[in-house]
């Protein structure tokens, strides 16, 4: 289980918290979504889970153990796929996998067959010799996913995994994530697409101005949007204005 307890992040020079007293539990085997607009604090939460950002206050636990940057055993259990393409454009697909294996000290007899398996799973087995800069956006996303899976993590965390992709590529990524979750992997993603969160997630947390305003199943959130006053993504308007119809809620994309 991933647990956040009173997590706070304030950036140097800021007078407000980017993440403000967030407490959350993500259960093993769950597909969980953080839904909110750009600037809501979703990526900051992901940054702290990846240990790239230090907490200002609070605590993160993985399997009831405090999660620290130096705890490599726990870090191996958790892989993060960032929103931006964190790939070297001058390397081939295969070299990207090899570099990841070396960073984690994986023996060749393990990472070579594992890489072949993952690239096939992600539909990239015929692209091994292709330079990254020649890949489409969808292929780059798939490569980042394959790379993240190389260490055989228990927890997969993705920050806006389909942003900027065409509908076909989005569906392909969704299908891969569903399969991984069905195989028992715990998946946490951030998104500002209500349809994406509803389609994939068992539970959704609404994130607004650094706070979690509601956690519920997609069905309950959608059912309540027409009558239950919840904070929407801009933090000003109520559901009666933005979500007067359930259909609108499903197709709403936060600005």
Question: What kind of feature is each model-predicted range?
Answer:
Residues 98, 102, 109-127:
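Conserved ABC ATPase "signature" region
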Residues 131-135:
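Conserved ABC ATPase signature
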Residues 156-159:
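Catalytic Walker B motif of ABC-type/P-loop ATPase nucleotide-binding domains
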Residues 215-216:
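ABC ATPase "signature
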Residues 1-4, 8-21, 28, 70-71:
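A short, flexible loop at the N-terminus of ABC-type nucleotide-binding domains that lies
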């Amino acid at each position: 289980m991933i647990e956040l307890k009173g997590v706070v992040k304030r950036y140097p020079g800021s007078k407000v918290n980017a993440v403000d007293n967030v407490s959350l539990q993500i259960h093993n085997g769950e597909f969980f979504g953080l839904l909110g607009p750009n600037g809501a604090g979703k990526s900051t939460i992901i940054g702290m889970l990846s240990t790239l950002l230090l907490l200002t206050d609070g605590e993160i636990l993985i399997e009831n153990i405090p999660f620290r940057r130096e705890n490599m055993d726990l870090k191996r259990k958790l892989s993060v796929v960032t929103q931006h393409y964190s790939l070297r454009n001058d390397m081939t697909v295969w070299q990207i996998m090899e570099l990841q294996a070396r960073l984690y000290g994986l023996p060749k007899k393990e990472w070579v067959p594992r890489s072949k398996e993952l690239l096939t799973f992600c539909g990239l087995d015929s692209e091994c010799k292709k330079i990254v800069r020649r890949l489409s956006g969808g292929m780059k996303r798939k490569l980042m996913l394959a790379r993240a899976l190389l260490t055989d993590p228990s927890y997969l965390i993705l920050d806006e995994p389909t942003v900027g992709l065409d509908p076909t590529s989005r569906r392909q990524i969704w299908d891969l994530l569903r399969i991984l979750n069905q195989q028992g992997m715990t998946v946490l993603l951030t998104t500002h697409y209500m349809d994406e969160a509803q389609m994939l997630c068992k539970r959704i947390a609404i994130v607004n101005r650094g706070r979690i305003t509601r956690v519920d199943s997609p069905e309950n959130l959608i059912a309540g949007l027409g009558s239950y006053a919840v904070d929407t993504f801009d933090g000003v308007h109520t559901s009666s204005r933005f979500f007067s119809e359930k259909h609108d809620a499903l197709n709403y994309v936060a600005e």
